[in-house]
Amino acid sequence: MMTVDNDTNLVALTFAQEKEGVEYFDEAKMKQTLADVRAEKLTAWVDNTKDEPLIAQLPKPGKIKKETKNDVLGYTELQLSNGATVILKKTDFKDDEVRLNGFAKGGKALYGQADYSNMKVFDFAANACGLGNFTNNELEKALAGKQANVSLSLGMNWNTVNGSSTPKDLETMMQLLYLHFTALKKDEKAYNTLVNMLETTLKNRDLQPEAQFSDSIYAGLYAHNPRFTPLVAKDLKNISLDRIMQIAHERFAAANNFTFTIIGNFDEQTIRPLVCQYIASLPGKEKAVASPEARTYFTGKASIDFKRKMETPKPYIAKFLGGDIDYTLKNDIMASYAGEVLSQILLKAVREDAGATYSIGAYCGLQPRQEGKARLQVQIQSPISKPELVDTALQITNKCIKDAAEKVDPEMVAKVKANFLKDADVNAKKNNHWENIIFEYKTRGIDTYTEYKKIVEAVTPADISAFIKNEILAKGNDLNIIMRPE
């Protein structure tokens, strides 16, 4: 075995982008790094894979109390003895896929400002934990050769658990689900590794103009609400593994308020005993908790226009429009139409005709809120080709939206409609698409599948113009964010 025990014929190199504020490796640091490596005491690798089952003692199985079928959406709903609901939808879309999704009311909105930083890293930290008798690293080794995973997540108003497996490893996925609810294990080593990785990633973030532009978008869009700010380096000083573990236990202590969907290629009969063994056996005495509406949005007309030093001068613009609207399938479809049509209009006018941008697109969609409402949000974002074309690009964008509120090209609408119908047929054969369909149906009572194509077919160019005029422009909310080079 060859080792380098002196500096003869040794060259150490470091490559880094030259930028103000960036910390570089100097000669002293490089020498110290080499010395640290040589001083390490290395031991031979030992395979310490644990030769034991994931669950040392299986829980007493629960029971299925009731079964009902939904013939419209093609699933079977099971009511379990612990109060949990399980929805089974067998498909043949992918031979090697079974998907798990669980959801219950709760989420980040239940926690105040003292936990904002913890909320930003919750998903990372919770999934760096161990399970049962296994550390995170030991768990990875124990699962080698298996295709099964489960993870926890907190949305703004929902506690969620997601997983996937092959049919062969379905029971392993169910065991992982059980352990996430009952035996989440604090793993300081894995947590510290995560924090170190985040520190490295975020260290030079603020030096990037794109990050500063993103921060301005968050601040403007969410009305400077500190809950809605991106993860930055200083957040890492305010996070606590103990607190994150406590929150995880609070949100995932019991399963009685959860609905679990299992979709994919599984055996209809053998899955029921697994449901009883690993889901019906979970604790089930938690009171339902509905979280408050936490999202705040800008209102009225506003502009954030600032300059930043850039090595390569490249301005950015972002425009936001919209307001509150009823959360319905028709409005969701109309929003999608508006976004696609505006994208095509802007691409031609701002990029192709004016040459003012490298690329431009419009996203228009509904962000669900409480009590059957949603926030209709139009987002137009673009890097501008030349600093002197910023105002021109905005003027053209504003004119295009105003003109679209009066009339849109029927041929353009026909192309969008054809794409929507084609995508609907493709998506109908995807397990993750059915997860979304069932989630919307169970949480908001909206069937986004049965009437979808019928509504898409019926939309006319006049409908789209009326939607842009009445539901976008008439709201009177218009936010422009502009970042120019110094």
Residue ranges and their predicted role:
Residues 1-113, 256-261, 266-309, 322, ...:
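Proteolytic maturation boundary segments
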Residues 1-2, 9-17, 87, 94-127, ...:
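M16 family metallopeptidases and their MPP-like homologs
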Residues 251-253:
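Conserved alpha/beta enzyme-core scaffolds, especially Rossmann-like or related mixed alpha/beta domains
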